[in-house]
UniProtKB/Swiss-Prot annotation:
Role, per record: Regulates the mitotic activity in roots.
Start-end of Basic and acidic residues biased regions: 32-41
Expression tissues: Expressed in roots, stems and leaves.
Top-level taxon of origin: Eukaryota
Residue numbers spanned by region Disordered: 1-41
Species of the source: Arabidopsis thaliana (Mouse-ear cress)
Organism classification: Eukaryota, Viridiplantae, Streptophyta, Embryophyta, Tracheophyta
Protein name: WPP domain-containing protein 3
Bias type Polar residues, positions: 1-20
Entry's localization field: Cytoplasm; Nucleus
Statement: the UniProt record of this protein carries the keyword rRNA processing: no
The UniProt record lists the keyword Nucleus: yes
Cross-referenced Gene3D superfamilies: WPP domain
Length: 157
């Protein structure tokens, strides 16, 4: 049996200039790039490179909130198990979850922000599931009682 060696070729290219129409979409990324560039310049003098992903810009935080609202208020894996909630309530819950997760994640000290981002993701996920479970348990008992009552009434008819 003949063995072959696979070769991996990589190409490094410089970023293309941003188009005017996409400037709004990429402003967050550009801000992070400029912040990272200034930090890299400072670190290059001492021989290292520093890149940080924390804190996220407001657009990123808004995206997380909107994703949670969608998950809580429309058909999703979470709503399949726990049911959906009204979009207005989902909005308030999602904003609260995101703020708490952000506060907790901001307490960690990490030079590149990876630990902060990890904690942020874990906190938002766990809090969203806990929130759905609490609402399900609070509403589930009433729904169970209602369903049993309906079944009893159907038997009597």
């Amino acid at each position: 049996m003949a063995e072959t060696a696979d070769t991996i070729n990589t190409t490094v290219s410089t970023p293309q200039p941003q188009l005017e129409s996409r400037s709004d979409e990429t402003s967050c990324l550009q801000k992070h790039r400029s912040d990272a560039t200034s930090e890299v310049t400072k670190e290059e003098k001492s021989g290292g490179i520093l890149f940080s992903v924390w804190p996220p810009c407001q657009k990123s935080r808004d995206y997380v909130v909107n994703s949670m609202i969608k998950t809580l208020s429309t058909d999703s894996i979470l709503s399949y198990k726990y049911g959906t909630i009204k979009p207005e309530e989902a909005s308030a819950v999602a904003k609260s979850i995101e703020e708490k997760a952000y506060d907790i994640a901001s307490r960690f000290v990490s030079s590149d922000g990876i630990k902060n981002l990890e904690v942020y993701g874990i906190e938002t996920s766990e809090r969203m599931i806990e929130s759905a479970e609490v609402r399900f348990k609070a509403n589930g008992s009433m729904e169970l009682l209602l369903n049993q009552t309906i079944k009893m009434m159907q038997l009597l008819i």
